Amino acid sequence: MYKQERYIFRAATEEDIRELAAIEKICFSENEACSYEEVKDRVEQAPEDFLIAFDQVNKKIAGYMSGIHSGSEVFLDEFFQNASLQEKGAKHCFLLGLEVRPEYQGKGLASQIMNRYIDMEEERGTEKIFLTCHTHFVPFYSGFGYEHLGKSPSTWGGESWE
């Protein structure tokens, strides 16, 4: 496990877009990964809804989490593609991805990012945080207090989601 001081946790900037999009392509299958333009639009619309773990030693983004705020209680596939659905100040956050580069996986970084993101949303007054995931990730997210609500109606990327 890395020491926490190794990382700077921060919001996204326009300078991060290319690297964020590249990490998206590494961490998700081709049909699931958001395009460069979709990542760019989300960063431009709400950079504060990204939490980046920047590795100070290797001078690169090690991982990140992103979300979108909405008054909805339904996780819409359109959240991935349409950054204009962002409702600043809405009390619900929908997590769009937790990505950690392969060389940083298994060292506790995803948990650090998740815990910090939850804290960040609580400080903002967010009332509910929603996410979808593949079945094998349900135990990971349950460990953070997420309640498994069963199969999601989402078909993002032609996949089945929980």
Where are the predicted features?
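A short beta-loop-alpha structural element at the N-terminal edge
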Residues: 6-20
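Active-site rim helix/loop that mediates acceptor-substrate recognition in acyltransferases
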Residues: 29-57, 64-85
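Conserved acyl-donor/pantetheine-binding loop and adjacent beta-alpha core of acyl/acetyltransferases
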Residues: 60-99, 105, 115, 155-162
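Conserved catalytic-core motifs of GNAT/GCN5-like acyltransferases
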Residues: 72, 132, 142, 147-162
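Conserved glycine-rich acetyl-CoA-binding loop
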Residues: 87-88, 101-115, 124, 139, ...
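Conserved GNAT acetyl-CoA-binding A-motif
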Residues: 114, 119-134
